[in-house]
Amino acid sequence: MFLATLYFALPLLDLLMSAEVSGGDRLDCVKASDQCLKEQSCSTKYRTLRQCVAGKETNFSLTSGLEAKDECRSAMEALKQKSLYNCRCKRGMKKEKNCLRIYWSMYQSLQGNDLLEDSPYEPVNSRLSDIFRAVPFISDVFQQVEHISKGNNCLDAAKACNLDDTCKKYRSAYITPCTTSMSNEVCNRRKCHKALRQFFDKVPAKHSYGMLFCSCRDIACTERRRQTIVPVCSYEERERPNCLSLQDSCKTNYICRSRLADFFTNCQPESRSVSNCLKENYADCLLAYSGLIGTVMTPNYVDSSSLSVAPWCDCSNSGNDLEDCLKFLNFFKDNTCLKNAIQAFGNGSDVTMWQPAPPVQTTTATTTTAFRVKNKPLGPAGSENEIPTHVLPPCANLQAQKLKSNVSGSTHLCLSDSDFGKDGLAGASSHITTKSMAAPPSCSLSSLPVLMLTALAALLSVSLAETS
């Protein structure tokens, strides 16, 4: 009985363990596509799916539409068993655009595209604390500089960039095209955008974030921060387009569409979490935000008195789509997750220093709570932009405070939904709806080996009892 138990149980346990390992192995879409094209069955279904996407863009005929959709669904179901279905891309990778093209050929919904799409990028799961450990703090770097500015962190960050060869190289590379006028245009916007993308993709976050998310106490500092991306070229235009029109334009470009989806995925606010971020990860939110810079959806600070950001667009001429337009715009302007992430970077703190909040109850429903705008008076102009230093430790250091004092600390130092009213549009809807075909959630098998071991132990006990 004992040997029979081992004979059947061990192969099953080995199978589960191998499944757990392979589940974590995810190919990038370029490699997954190459692998698929080498298999006859996969290659046939993949070509069918690509024709489906092309057919959707040119509109199916009314007579063949239903048959075509059934064939498309059949192809998608077959590909769910292949590595291509679960592939992702990496930001800044060598063949990023090609990788993203393959990804969207898999996940572009046949029913249409909506605001919130799953990110095509492999999760980074980095932390602000990782960035802080990468290089010395800016204040330490500036001990090497004779004339240090007093209180202008953004100026200090620019000087720190000049001390780093990589940062200096890529900063100069975008300053030139972004400030050089040509014919009747202010600059070469296309070259400016490309150089900005390279800057934020190639330069260490400690330096690029130091310039983009520097904490400020006065207008001179905040204005320098606002000017970081040379907005007169990269951001502003003669006219403001409608935000939904800008979104449609963004979705015609693989890079822009992907960066926008990444932003909505990683900066999703959640009022019930301690950090006000659904994913409780500030670094991933800042990475996603910076990824938008250099696309047609380039965001920037709306003024020099707050942390509110927005793309260069408004909701005029929205007609019946006004509510959807406001949802889109307010996701940028009143995003508590992003604002807390910017403040945490300025503080030199991180969300990992908190006591983990109880898991937010989420479902697979197609509606995700984005934000709730409430009218509540703020302090003096610019106060929300200032990093609180009169209370120690600020925001993300609350858990350390709890451990020292052995009392439950309050989390009210972080921004919450109720703290915004100054820049918000009152009455905006609090939900963003998605109907797009998102990638399937990865199934965790980590608990199965434990269950199998438990079952195996029970079988062994029974076997030993019978033999005795």
Curated annotation (Swiss-Prot):
Q: Which UniProt keywords apply?
A: Cell membrane, Disulfide bond, Endosome, Glycoprotein, Golgi apparatus, GPI-anchor, Lipoprotein, Membrane, Receptor, Repeat, Signal
- Classify the main location: membrane
Disulfide bond entries: C36-C42, C154-C214, C161-C167, C178-C192, C187-C233, C216-C221, C243-C313, C250-C256, C267-C285, C277-C337, C315-C325
One GO BP annotation is: neuron projection development
User: Which Pfam family, giving just one, matches this sequence?
Assistant: GDNF
Residues carrying the lipid (GPI-anchor amidated serine) are S430
Q: What is the annotated tissue distribution of the protein whose record heads this document?
A: Expressed in liver, brain, kidney and cochlea.
Q: Where are the sequence repeats?
A: 25-113, 150-238, 239-342
Mode of membrane association: Lipid-anchor; GPI-anchor
Gene3D superfamilies from the xrefs? GDNF binding domain (1.10.220.110)
* Family designation: Belongs to the GDNFR family.
Q: How does it assemble?
A: Interacts with GDNF ligand and RET: forms a 2:2:2 ternary complex composed of GDNF ligand, GFRA1 and RET receptor. Interacts with SORL1, either alone or in complex with GDNF. Interaction between SORL1 and GFRA1 leads to GFRA1 internalization, but not degradation.
This chain belongs to the protein called GDNF family receptor alpha-1
Organism lineage: Eukaryota, Metazoa, Chordata, Craniata, Vertebrata
* Gene expressing this chain: Gfra1
